[in-house]
């Protein structure tokens, strides 16, 4: 029996921050890769220059690269005051990529969306993929990303093309010239003692190679829909998922079986095994002898409950019949094609703890840097007033303000997401924790700017 043919990859936006990390991961495993972008920054893979909104230019790159899988990461950076550019790249450009893919018989399209497509300025707590984008987006960037995502999902099944969209949150890491650049500027201006909000809001940051890893998993598992037996379904949704513990380490859970946490008065049966599994750093090995795997208990409100899965499948079938041959084809929440997935580090942290970890690392290598000063905290309402004044002044002098109401809101709300679907369906597990990720990013930044390690 012959092995399945390997995909040939074209990375749209392959010279960019995320795109480059995807290229490096593909090269590391021996795949054939080309890139399409407006600027060539690397010379280790074939490069095709062009405008993403021009379908003929994208199509030529697809033909020359012989791509069977396109990973579309291209986008203007968040935070620029140019709605027309966002629409041109994220909507018109995405449609051009879809058209070129269908015209040239590409099998797979993986689209980099954003967790921000469901953000409307309110708290997002353990949000899963059932939440639709709001009627009014927070800004032009997320509005255009939501529309691009909609186009990609609607194209699933068109001309044999299978599609999937990933929604990463707060990407950071080596090569980032947005998050790290902004935090470095605050550090250089000695403004690290200012805080807006009470810092009780959890936020999802995601290390860049984890996001790249998720894209490869999505591409690998983007295959035609098949019927899942009850056993296959159970294998996906009922196995034990340990908590992500790359930064915090494994923690002993005070379950009824673990009590009392102190010395036993009368040791229960299997006392030694119980103690051993709570001290075992391998979460899977903790359940080798007693009640393995632990039961997965779901309510009807759970995103992967039987009721929710059945409802999704029924609606997908109805939608497919209405669209007939034009697409989209039926989808299944336990398979990749036609789906969206939140991608995070699985380690939501208090918002201001992340920048302070970066500043702390910068301060260690900068002996001349002033010591950390007493913290000055502004309530959210005050921050919004100051941001409004900054926006007004920026408009008056024709300069883009660095301090905006969006950024104030961004820093004061809960924004963290449920990645169970990605872990179960994609097989995604973060590879690099937040603490290690911050270290790698700061080490890269220091090397780039000639700072002491």
For the regions a language model picked out, list residue spans one by one.
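Flexible, glycine-rich beta-alpha linker
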Residues: 119, 140, 160-182, 201
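Mid/C-terminal beta-alpha module of Rossmann-like enzyme folds, strongest
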Residues: 221-401
